[in-house]
Amino acid sequence: MKQFFEFLITTFLLLGLAAADEHIVYWNSTNSLFRNRQPTIEVRMGDVVRFVCPDNEEGRNDGEYLIVYEVTEFAMDDCALESHSREVIRCAPEGTAEKVLRTQQLSGGRREDWKKQKVPPKNVAQLIRQLNPIPNGKEYQPGQTYYYMTTSTGKANGTNHRMYGLCESQNMRLSMKVSASQPHPTRRAPTRRQEDFVTTASAELMGGQEDEDSDNDNAHLLPRDLEGSTNPKFRRPSQLETAGVENQQFMKVVQMAQAGKTGTFENEKEAIAQKSSEKDGWHPVNVQYVADLMNNAYQNADERISYQRDFEIHEENDLAVKSLEYSSSSTSLSTNFAILLAVIYVLY
């Protein structure tokens, strides 16, 4: 029953690995693979390696009976089993019950079919996986090499032989190199130039504004008409307002440059703004207001307390700058009159 459940689990795993590669190793002395000095196969994670026993039909006198072991590199080089060597498959003479069970599994359990069906050679599949759902199943790691061999003599009575055997006489040993799984091909996004395409993401980074095609799901693949874009951030320089250099002024500069002349020219907008500010007013105080204030101060001198400022106004037309200077005096009319009386009293 245990073997039946392991067979079912293996079958489902193989169905799930239909896209993986399957490597079949016919483990018999006539396989040309063992003619190489160092028999080696290369597999990837997710592949399946199937070891197939020799085809020992009933009545054949040249049948081979053996056991395949997973061993260390040192044991494979010496063709000698170690205590922890793992048995992979036993290609020994099968009993009647074992043949019947295996034939039923292959024929789907129908009695009338398995009696007529030829029994195929015994085989076992090794799933090259890092995690194996089968209890005590072998787990493999990428980048590692695993070694297999048989020390059986090939005869029925020499199946359990633990040294030399077919490993030495027929070079029946194998190195299996495991590499990483086949990488899946990645889809590369189409290459876009910044000046030809505008994406929704770029619009968000530049202020959260999008143009008229942003509602399209494939908007990032559509070329935009930058001349007619509603977003000023995506307009061409021809759409932007001038920075104060008018066309006539620019053409004049070009003509001067072609004639070999040098010099500077003033930004017209800034010049106009500066003249307008000078015409509208000046700082710090309005001249007419100060003049009126002074006249009122002199007319009411007798009624004011003894502190009055004398102002002097300057206007420099050549620099278009108006300034205001002042000097202070702490004398008043009443104070001067008192001093005059005191002087007359002393003299007389």
Swiss-Prot record:
A molecular function GO annotation: ephrin receptor binding
Main location per the UniProt record: membrane
SUPFAM superfamilies linked: Cupredoxins
Residues annotated as signal peptide: 1-20
Glycosylated sites: 28, 157
Phenotypic effect of disruption: Worms have widespread defects in embryonic morphogenesis of the posterior body and defects in postembryonic male tail morphogenesis.
PROSITE patterns with a match to the protein in the record: EPHRIN_RBD_2
Lipid attachment points (GPI-anchor amidated serine): 329
Cross-referenced Pfam families: Ephrin
Topology in membrane: Lipid-anchor; GPI-anchor
Region (Disordered): 207-237
Modification(s) after translation: May undergo proteolysis by metalloprotease sup-17 to give rise to a soluble form.
GO cellular component: axon; neuronal cell body; plasma membrane; side of membrane
Domain Ephrin RBD: 21-178
Task performed by this protein: Regulates the formation or stabilization of cell-cell contacts at several stages of epithelial morphogenesis. In early embryonic development, involved in ventral closure of the epidermis. During male tail morphogenesis, regulates precursor cell sorting together with mab-20 and allows the formation of distinct sensory rays. Probably acts as a ligand for lad-2 to regulate axon guidance of several neurons including SDQL, SDQR, SMD and PLN neurons during neurogenesis.
Family in the record: Belongs to the ephrin family.
Subunit-level organization: Interacts with lat-2.
Note in the entry: In contrast to other ephrins, does not seem to signal through the vab-1 receptor.
Name of the protein: Ephrin-4
Annotated source species: Caenorhabditis elegans
